[in-house]
Amino acid sequence: MVKSQEAGGGREVFRVAEDLRARIAGGAYPLGSFLPPQRELATEFDVARDTVQKALEVLKGEGWIESRQGSGTRVVKVMQVQSDTAKDAKEGQVTLREFFDEAFDAPEIVLDVYTLTSESLNTQVKTQVDRIRDRKVAPRKVALRMLLPAQSLDSPYPRALAGPDEPQRDRPDDELTVRLKERLHDIERHNSASIRQSLLQLQAEGLLESAHIEIRYVKIPPVLKLYLINGTQAVHGPYTITERPIVLPDTETIRALDVVPMDSKLMHYVKDADPRSRSSVFVDTWQEWFDSVWDHLAR
């Protein structure tokens, strides 16, 4: 197999995994439901069945699905947010999709986001773009500031793990670790570009009056993801460190130490009339933190 074909195969694995992940997050495949058979997915995406299998391995490694021979592939996780407000506490956990649905019901949306790759955000933005195109919501303005880790950052993850008969892989210049980080940067570039293009396209078509997107990079390895909306709400949760298989662009699968953004347990806080309440202090504190990093450290 030539190099270009191998790279293309990796891109197809990424494309299929991204699409299926978005469907799960968007509710097309609810918790406990089964994905279509692999043969059907291969036909739909116009790829080889082996590509579908590798994409499913990616989702399995992220904790979205589980597969059992003869039983199909079942969804075992959806992105949920536990609210700290009295109203939502009665309703229990809500999905991140429901949270963004409510946010985009407003005429103006101001989003400040601190994240590793913006993969989750891209999924939610695509869903809201569809709602806007379907005339289900009609916001006028969207302003997004996003903080991402600088590519020059020597982050402790992702990192290739040694096999049973291999020496320890603890050097930052280890070949597989370098390739893992290149893959991470590719994912970040893809998702941030997709977010920018999606929102600016809505503005170009007149479906948004204004779309302002600004992205800066900071030399801080994310240990949590943070969404701040309109200065009044905060959603945050820690990243989970885990060992999992990762498919590289040349389709090689390696064992690695990584974080699983989609596995975060997100908490939701809403400012109220009491500036000293736990929720109000939480939102204000994290907004101040974001602004300080944006102004003094990010480039």
Regions found by a protein language model. Give the residues of each.
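Extreme N-terminal segment that seeds HTH/winged-HTH DNA-binding domains in transcriptional regulators
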Residues: 1-39, 43-44
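Short, cationic-aromatic polyanion-contact patches
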Residues: 12-13, 37, 71-88
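Short helix-terminating capping/connector loops at secondary-structure junctions
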Residues: 31, 137-142, 205-212
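N-terminal helix-turn-helix
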Residues: 31-69, 74-75
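PLD-like (HKD) phosphodiesterase/transphosphatidyltransferase domain
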Residues: 80-170, 273-275
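Short, flexible loop/turn elements at secondary-structure junctions
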Residues: 115-117, 217-221, 230
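HKD-type phospholipase D/PLD-like phosphodiesterase module
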Residues: 164-223
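Amphipathic alpha-helical interface segments
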Residues: 227-299
